[in-house]
Amino acid sequence: MAGRLQVEVRLQDGVIRAVDTRLQRPLAQLSRLLVGQTAEAALARLPLLFSLCAAAQQVAALRALERAAGWTAEPEVERGRSQLTELELIRESLLRLVQVWELPLPLERLKVLVALCRRGAARLQPLTSFRAPSLPADPHLQETLAELAAAWADLELPITADWLGPRLGRWQEVVLGGPPPAVFDPADLSALLAQLRSGDTRASIAGQPRITGPLCAAEAQLSAAAQIEQHVGALLRHTAQAIDSLQQPSPPPAVAGLLAGEGVGLAQTARGALLHRVCLDEGTVGAWQLLAPTDWNFHEDGPLRRRLCGVRVAEEDAGALLRELILAVDPCVAFEVKIIHA
């Protein structure tokens, strides 16, 4: 289901005076499509609702539904599901790096890496069924993961500054504002759960925004050029780390304090942490809530507002700067930029 991001900036005398971030996501409509369904029927609908991060959406939903139903998946099942989301993360990150940031990766090499990700994901697809049993030992999967690691190790990629330098040079003198929000921590889940139970689906903890994903690994930089370079470099490092951890992916964090019939599922995407919260009532969905990385990273008081307010930029460059920073934070929806000259 599509959403849209609108970012409006008020510029006065060459200084950004205000940043208004409006994220429109059809989460209420999505919930209505899933409420009243059985777990199996709801899972069957998910691929029709999401195109980006489709595997992560399935895995987060599965974890939430199974927990709500009182079912604990076997460790090997959870391991395979984490491998599935990591393969999707790798594929989507590589495509983003090449298509948006022009990573100098030869097309044939990219095709090989993407094909290996898809081949591995196909072997793991049976684990996306409700209460899935463990899969038998799969030498073809292990061979695919080994080929992917070898293909990545064989690459000789330049450092981020070398290939991004010409594109970002115009932003070297643009000095950014204050630091971004704090990082979303699974330790905050109990506070977040209390909010969700009350019907508050805002992406914040005690009213304060958080950030997630590769964005968290990017150190706050003084210049816009250095900040964008940090974001893109963090995405590249995140991809490499996912490839390295494929054989032993991290288990999902435990969620304590759940009520009877309530389940929470977490999964990692190329953009950060994805969360589904589900309540089952006699086998059917009574409530369904979702928080995606874009909800966190494009909060109205998120990194865009905090880093851009008070920034001095030439009027003719404001739109281009804003677009580059939005691309660096990486929304999962289409976006539009509006500059108001006060």
UniProtKB/Swiss-Prot annotation:
Signal peptide: none
InterPro entries in the cross-refs: Ni-dep_hyd_lsu, NiFe-Hase_large, NiFe/NiFeSe_hydrgnase_LSU
Example GO molecular function: nickel cation binding
Any Pfam family: NiFeSe_Hases
Coiled coil: none
Family: Belongs to the HupK family.
Name this protein carries in UniProt: Hydrogenase expression/formation protein HupV
Organism: Azotobacter chroococcum mcd 1
Source lineage: Bacteria, Pseudomonadati, Pseudomonadota, Gammaproteobacteria, Pseudomonadales
